[in-house]
Amino acid sequence: MNTNTLIEIPERYKQFRAGISKFATSKDNKRIENNDQAIIIYFDETDNIEPLLFDKDIVVINDEMNGTPFNQFVAEINFIESNSFEIKKLSKYVAINNSSYSIEDINSINIIGKVIKLIRSFD
């Protein structure tokens, strides 16, 4: 896969640490597939993440009890109403179910990062 393409990180995210991560997920998921990579910005524990997230963002959640050998997994965040949001898993391997939360709980979900650019594998 050619990942040498220059990708511009939006100005609002330049204060955060960024990295490239690979995904391993189910083949039946149309949004993220095996061997896809993503540029992820990582949040600090002290960051208020609510203003950094938009409807239908893909986030990285740290949860050791997610049912996979890894502490982290990706999920879609969807703001359903002005006072609540939903976390939807993007892999059938993750044991955690889709859940809805109050907006006040957004900083306690353990969202540690956000996918800002998906790099599709055409292998």
Mark where each language-model region is.
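Acidic/glycine-rich C-terminal interaction modules and beta/coil loop segments
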Residues: N4-D123
